[in-house]
Amino acid sequence: MDEEALLKQFAAQFAHGPDDADDTDAAAAAQGADSTANQVADDADQSPATFDTQQFLNGLDAIFDRHTAATEAGPYLEQAMVDAENAGDEAGLLTVLNETMGFYRSQGRHKENQWIVQRALELAARMGLTTGTSEAWAITLINCATSMRAAKQYDQAEDLYHQAQSVCRHSLAPTDRRLAALHNNLSMLYSETNRPDKAELELREALRIIEASSVNPDADIDVSSSHTNLALTLLTEHKLEDAHWHAAKALEIYRTGHLEHSAHYASALAGFAQVCFAERRYADAVTGYRHALAVIEECYGKDTDYWRITADNLRQAEEAAAQAGVTVDNAGVAGDAGALPQSGSRLPNSPAQGKTGA
C-alpha cells in the first residue's frame, strides 16, 4: 500500500475526528524536517509567532525527569501543537506530533493516538516528505506504525513498518539505533500476530545493531531492552533456561550502569518476573512485579495500561505463591539470583515497554 492509499484509509476511518465514535527520536525528526519545511514554505519566518522546537523538547524532558508526566505531559503537548500550528512551523509541529504519539501510547490513549497518526501522515505529505527518504519521514513512519501496533491495528501497522524499512535503507546508517528500534518494534508486531519465527529474526538483527553501536554493551539500556524482549520470546517458545539468562542479563546491565532510576527499568523487572513465574519461582516473581509496579507508578502514574497489566500480573503471582505455600520476602530485590547460567540461544519481544520508545 502506498502513502496516498494509506492516507485515504486513515481519512475515511477518522473523517469526523476521534471523539465521535463510541513515542523514537523526535529531535532528529525535527532536524531532518527543517530543510524540507523551508523549501515548502519559504515565508514561514514572516509569521509574528515563533516556535522553539528545542525549548519544547527540553521542557518535555524536564517533565519526565521530575516524574510528573501523568499529569503534566498531556496538556503540555496539546499546547505545543497549538503553538507550532499558530507559528506556521510545520517541522516543529511534526516534532510535537511524534512526541505525542509516544506519550499517548504509554498512557493507553490509543483511539486519540490514531487521530494523531493521521495528522502526522497528512502533515508529512504536505511537507513533501512522503516522496523522499529523509530521516524525518523514516522516524514519523516508525512512530506511526508503533502507535497503530499498540492500538492493535496490525495490518496498517505492518504496512507502515515496511514503508519505514524502505526509507531507512536510504536514510539511516547500518548501525543507527533507530534502525534497531524498527527491527525491535516489528518483532513485537510479529509476536503479537503469532509469527514467532519472524519475531526472532527481527530481534536478532536489532540486538546485533545495538551491540555493534554501543560503547559499552554491558551498561547500555537499549541492549538491556533487547535482552528482555528476547527473554520473553524465548519464554513463549518454552526455552526457560535461555529465557532466564537473558532476563537476568537485562537486570545486570541496569545495575552495572547504575541505571535503576530509568523509567525503562520497569520493563526489565517485569520481564524477569514473568520468566520466574513460568519457572514457578513465585517469590522472585512477586518481588519483581512489586518493584516494577513501584517504578511504573513513580514514572507514569497508576492510570496507564502498564500499571494495570503489571498489577494484574502481581496479583496472579501472589495468588500462586500463596497456593504453593511460598513466603515472599518484601525486602528482596528482583534479579538477585546469583551467577548467571550459560545461554545458547537468542531473541525478542516484550508485552511491557516503557516510554518511548520503543
Where are these regions (language model features)?
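Flexible helix-coil transition and linker loops at the boundaries of alpha-helical arrays
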Residues: 45, 82-90, 123-134, 168-175, ...
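Ankyrin-repeat and related helical/solenoid repeat scaffolds used for protein-protein interactions
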Residues: 245-316
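Conserved alpha-helical positions within TPR/SEL1-like repeat arrays
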Residues: 58-65, 92-106, 135-150, 177-192, ...
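Terminal, low-structured helical/coil segments at or just beyond the last alpha-helical repeat
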Residues: 301-358
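Flexible inter-repeat linkers and adjacent short helices
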Residues: 1-127, 131, 135, 340-358
